[in-house]
Design a protein with these regions (language model features):
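Beta-strand-enriched, solvent-exposed domains that form extended recognition/catalytic surfaces
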Residues: 159-327
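Disordered, acidic Ser/Thr/Pro-rich linker "stalks" and the adjacent N-terminal cap
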Residues: 1-62, 75-82, 153-158
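Short beta-strands within extracellular/lumenal beta-sheet-rich domains
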Residues: 47-64, 114, 220-241
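Exposed low-complexity, polar/acidic, P/S/T/G-rich flexible segments that act as propeptides
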Residues: 67, 137-161, 302-350
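Extended, low-complexity, turn-rich repeat/linker tracts enriched in Gly/Pro/Ser/Thr and Asp/Glu
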Residues: 74-84, 136-138, 254-260, 303
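Catalytic cores of extracellular degradative/oxidative enzymes
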Residues: 340-559, 584, 588, 600
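Trp- and acidic/polar-enriched beta-sheet ligand-binding modules for extracellular glycan
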Residues: 51-54, 65, 79-157
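Amphipathic alpha-helical substructures
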Residues: 565-604
């Protein structure tokens, strides 16, 4: 797309139409050209008070302009109030009094992310931006916006639209049967001429450049309904790698009427990588990525009904590719997909690639896949799917036919400890343990993966003071137990086999935490949250107790009710009841009392 540089348009003023202002952070900060300043709304008092309300800002251009797209920059700090999930943009054309129909957008939950909304309108004098106050699953109490920008496409855009007559539809992915090499000479834009020429010669590779995409239920709404962490916001990969600043032509064609916002998220999970979201609309989209990274379609509905499919063509997109069992990929298709990725990754340091099972969505480097799984990948996704299925069983989702279609995202990260960040589970510098079944089953690796997945699966009423690192461990402990007899498993169980020296003991013993709980509870008569506890080194006056010792009585109930098959639905019933009683006003004490009531009911 050489020679297709966009022009940033001048904005004369900004006016707050609906909403309020926090301190001196008014809307003028969104047109000062400084990403370090921002507009911020003031709180309405609670997340519930924010629900159904929006911030509306009206921008006036210096003169009427043809607008290609609008860019919204989210505030770059990590505060949850910096993140907005949805909204819309509408325009008022010069000489008109009626605003155009609003174009909706959804945004990545990432601080500092750019949100591009394709507008494609002529002679626009004013732009209104609406941002929803509430972000599902985040519980923010205000909205922040760092910068508003308007861009105009180059004149070449009209030449591209004129060339559509050579193609069968508006995706520009197939030529009409009457097209000849001679007639192609009428095409004025070099990139479209080259596209048509390669299509005519049978040389254009559409494997990942052209695909049909399906809608899915919003991962934030799934999380809110089940009172758990978000499912993958990158569950719909394109297999295309985008380079910062390099324009790409994206052709979009809906297969029916749709009112669901459609976006392209570009996420770079390499060290120091950034993320952005670009709103797409039917027809031609000329995009300029604000960052490099892999592309993902975000086409989210509010319920399970779904929306019409959409065909998308990324013209000459760089194909990293991906493997997805739901698309019909198997071990037979894996070598060709991996080889394509290796070729494309030659000039992309630490290029990342996605694999998707029925339950999980995993990302690692192309080099890691080539090293750890050069010939087959099915067993890799199967073992992670199996682990997650046991967590869903414990949550009551299997029994109640409520397992979400949305997948869970796990990523190879670049430093620190394994963690759950609200969007994905991060596993630093993890390759073999994620991608080699024999290593995955070694000692505590199932526990490590299940622990971070477990944080994302913690039911709201089953975590909090004292249980943040406990109820998620119940998931991974159960998964480790249920997978102990798998062919590659060493049979290792952390609670039963890991050595631990309880207070007062002369030496560490295997299963020492079980011994510690029995000694602290039955001999020393210490209360539950004081067992194997010490004063915090960084929180004066706060007692911290061993989370594995606190897990023991919960694990005993698992063994009695579920392993011994006394009440195999014990934990599913306890958690399912908790999911449907998510009163956020409950104190920690009330939550524990409610848990005991639910446990009594489930054990009856």
């Amino acid at each position: 797309t050489e020679g297709m540089g966009d022009t940033k348009l001048k904005v004369k003023s900004a006016e707050l139409i609906e909403g309020n202002v926090y301190g001196n952070q008014d809307v003028s900060k969104t047109i000062d050209g400084d990403y370090s300043t921002n507009y911020s709304s003031a709180s309405l008092g609670s997340p519930e008070a924010n629900r159904g309300h929006s911030i509306i800002i009206e921008y006036t251009l210096e003169q009427p302009e043809n607008i290609g797209y609008v860019r919204l920059m989210q505030r770059s700090n990590n505060d949850k109030n910096s993140l907005f999930a949805s909204g819309g943009v509408s325009v008022l054309k010069e000489g008109e009094t009626t605003w155009n129909e609003e174009i909706g957008f959804v945004a990545a939950q990432t601080a500092g992310a750019a949100v591009d909304i394709s507008v494609n309108s002529l002679q626009v004098s004013k732009v209104r931006v609406r941002i929803d106050r509430i972000t599902p699953g985040i519980d923010n109490v205000n909205v922040a916006l760092a910068e508003f920008e308007c861009y105009q496409y180059s004149d070449n855009t009209n030449d591209i639209l004129e060339a559509q007559k050579f193609f069968t539809d508006e995706t520009y992915s197939e030529l009409k049967g009457t097209v000849t090499s001679e007639s192609l000479k009428e095409i004025k834009t070099a990139v479209i001429y080259q596209l048509a020429k390669e299509l005519l010669e049978g040389k254009y590779d559409k494997k990942f450049r052209f695909s049909t995409y399906h809608s899915c239920k919003s991962p934030e709404i799934v999380a809110e309904e089940l009172t758990i962490g978000s499912r993958s916001i990158y569950d719909n990969p394109t297999g295309i790698y985008f380079t910062q600043g390099e324009q790409v032509l994206v052709f979009v064609m809906y297969k029916g009427a749709s009112n669901t916002p459609l976006s392209l998220a570009i996420a770079d999970y390499r060290e120091g990588g950034k993320k952005s979201v670009i709103s797409l609309r039917g027809g031609l989209n000329v995009i300029t990525p604000a960052n490099s990274g892999n592309g993902y379609i975000q086409y989210w509905t509010r319920d399970d009904a779904g929306d019409t499919d959409v065909d998308i063509h990324f013209c000459f997109g760089k194909q990293i590719g991906y493997w997805d069992v739901r698309r019909g990929d198997t071990d037979a298709t894996w070598p060709e997909i991996l080889e394509r990725a290796k070729r494309s990754a030659v000039d992309i340091p630490n290029a990342m690639m996605d694999i998707l099972g029925q339950r999980v969505h995993l990302q690692n480097t192309v080099n890691a896949f080539a090293k750890c799984a050069p010939n087959a990948i099915q067993a890799v996704v199967d073992m992670h799917d199996r682990m997650l299925d046991f967590e869903y069983l414990m949550m009551g989702l299997v029994k109640n036919n409520a397992v979400p279609a949305n997948r869970f995202f796990g990523v190879r990260s670049w430093g620190g400890s394994p963690n759950w960040n609200g969007v994905c589970a991060n596993y630093p510098n993890t390759e073999d343990a994620m991608l080699v079944p024999k290593v995955f089953y070694r000692k505590n690796n199932v526990w490590v993966f299940g622990h971070e997945f477990g944080h994302g699966n913690q039911v709201a009423q089953m975590k909090g003071n004292g249980w943040t690192e406990v109820t998620n461990n119940l998931y991974c402990s159960f998964a480790q137990y249920m997978m102990r007899n798998d062919p590659l498993s060493e049979g290792y169980l952390r609670l039963e086999h890991e050595s631990f020296k309880r207070p007062g003991a002369r030496s560490a013993l295997a299963g020492g935490r079980i011994n510690a709980f029995l000694n602290e509870a039955l001999v020393a008569h210490k209360s539950y949250f004081m067992q194997v506890a010490t004063i915090s080194t960084d929180k004066p006056g706060v007692w911290e107790s061993d989370p594995f010792v606190k897990l023991i009585p919960l694990w005993q109930m698992t063994m009695y009710f579920m392993a011994a098959y006394i009440k195999p639905d014990f934990w599913p019933d306890v958690r399912w009841a908790a999911i449907h009683d998510n009163d956020k006003s409950y104190s920690p004490g009330r939550r524990y009392v409610n848990f005991m009531k639910r446990a009594i009911d489930a054990s009856g």
